[in-house]
């Protein structure tokens, strides 16, 4: 005998009813429907709406969202590296003059505005913006050394995050690698020998941004190779534009000493420098090529330049950051605002959250820059591993654990977010 149909009182709610019951969650309706369907399949007679809400909350946490970085890593790659200031999203839409010449009304170049400002900031004749530093290196080598040799010291055949390897970039560019010197010692005469014996069109100097070779070592400076007769490309990576840091009232911080910069590399004789926009430069993800105008022109005319060109949002953000440099307004660049906060200032903030948990900490630059560097900082220390608890907050708070103690470093937390940390700690007490 067939089962009797469920009465209206016993029937489970429809998928649409479940989705509408959890519509207070900030998700598009189709995703709420997905959560409802999955909940029905899992419910087994339980509270299907509560199950749908749990699933929807998990879905919500897979989307891109704001987080609070309390790790003390200033340029945290997993959290987008350098934070940038976003203009109000509530303003009405507008177009931009990205490729419009307002004087003639004709089509212009998207590179003219931001690139000219960047060139001015780092003392270059010209500059070109692409979508990341790997693209910058690839484009330069493809445009200037295709089917020819590029001399690189064996100590600088680096791999950074994401599997970016200099030898593989050279292979993709159409150039071929000419290894020079040894892992720990490379001299000028090694480059002379390589140039004499091979069809070398470029010397590529690569900054050891995420590791150090110490002990019995020797490197060849850019200034020692300027008379070798071929262009020198300096991939400084980290994006410091001027070692003197004229945008900082007290000059460069001690932890920055020794970091190569765009301006000083060019002054030393580099023909081109390449670096990231979202590291020490403090802007959006981008690759910047700066140097001699004739070489930049060759890069801009190469077909790859179209492939790796950035969009209007990137160019606009870069323009804003570069103007802040030119006007020497470090407070307008979030990275430098964080990096120059004093320990005393951080301790005052920590005391307002909880005097019980105040502790000294050590922040780090991160982002594959300045390996081994620690920056004196302050924050909060709680006994036990609470990283998952903090990560489940709204907004999520990302912190670190060491020896079963949870650390929240305030150097990387915007002061306006202290209240969220305060509220989360109160839940633990």
Q: What function would you assign to each model-found segment?
A:
Residues 51, 76, 99-103, 404, ...:
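Catalytic, metal-anchored helix/loop core of enzyme active sites in primary metabolism
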Residues 36, 70-71, 81-105:
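Glycine-rich phosphate-binding segment of PLP-dependent enzymes
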Residues 1-59, 63:
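Long amphipathic alpha-helical segments
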Residues 63-64, 275, 395-400:
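A short linear hydrophobic-aromatic micro-motif
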Residues 12-13, 68-72, 281-284, 375, ...:
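Short Gly/Ser/Thr- and Asp/Glu-enriched loop/turn motifs at secondary-structure junctions
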Residues 105-322, 354, 424:
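Conserved PLP-enzyme active-site core in the AAT-like
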Residues 152, 314-315, 319-366:
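Conserved PLP-dependent catalytic core of the aminotransferase class-I/II
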Residues 347-421:
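Conserved C-terminal alpha-helix-loop-beta "cap" of PLP-dependent enzymes
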């Amino acid at each position: 005998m067939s089962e009797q149909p469920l009465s209206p009182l016993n029937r489970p709610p429809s998928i649409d009813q479940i989705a509408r019951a959890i519509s207070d969650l900030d998700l598009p309706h189709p995703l709420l429907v997905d959560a409802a369907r999955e909940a029905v399949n899992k419910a087994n007679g339980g509270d299907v709406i509560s199950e749908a809400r749990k699933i929807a909350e998990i879905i919500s946490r897979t989307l891109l969202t704001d987080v609070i970085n309390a790790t003390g890593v200033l340029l945290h790659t997993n959290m987008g590296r350098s934070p940038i200031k976003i203009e109000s999203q509530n303003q009405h839409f507008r177009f931009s003059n990205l490729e419009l010449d307002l004087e003639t009304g004709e089509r212009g170049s998207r590179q003219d505005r931001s690139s000219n400002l960047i060139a001015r900031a780092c003392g270059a004749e010209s500059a070109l913006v692409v979508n990341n530093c790997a693209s910058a290196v690839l484009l330069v080598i493809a445009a200037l050394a295709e089917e020819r040799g590029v001399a690189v010291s064996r100590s600088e055949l680096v791999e950074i995050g994401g599997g970016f390897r200099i030898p593989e970039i050279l292979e993709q560019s159409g150039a071929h690698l000419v290894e020079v010197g040894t892992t720990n010692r490379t001299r000028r005469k090694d480059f002379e020998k390589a140039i004499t014996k091979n069809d070398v069109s470029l010397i590529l100097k690569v900054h050891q941004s995420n590791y150090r070779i110490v002990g019995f070592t020797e490197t060849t400076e850019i200034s020692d190779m300027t008379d070798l007769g071929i262009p020198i490309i300096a991939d400084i990576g980290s994006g410091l534009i001027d070692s003197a840091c004229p945008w900082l009232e007290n000059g460069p911080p001690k932890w920055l000493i020794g970091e190569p910069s765009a301006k000083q590399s060019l002054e030393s004789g580099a023909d081109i420098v390449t670096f990231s926009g979202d590291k020490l430069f403090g802007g959006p993800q981008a690759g910047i090529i700066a140097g001699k105008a004739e070489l930049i022109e060759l890069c801009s005319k190469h077909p790859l330049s179209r492939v790796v060109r950035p969009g209007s949002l990137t160019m606009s953000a870069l323009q804003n950051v570069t103007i802040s440099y030119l006007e020497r307004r470090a407070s307008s660049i979030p990275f430098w605002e964080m990096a120059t906060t004093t320990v005393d200032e951080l301790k005052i903030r920590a005391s307002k959250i909880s005097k019980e948990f105040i502790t000294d900490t050590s922040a780090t630059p991160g982002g594959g820059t300045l390996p081994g560097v620690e920056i004196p900082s302050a924050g909060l220390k709680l006994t036990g591993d609470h990283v998952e608890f903090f990560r489940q907050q709204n907004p999520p708070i990302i912190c670190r654990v060491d020896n079963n103690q949870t650390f929240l470093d305030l150097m990387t937390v915007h002061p306006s977010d202290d209240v969220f940390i305060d509220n989360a700690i109160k839940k633990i007490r």
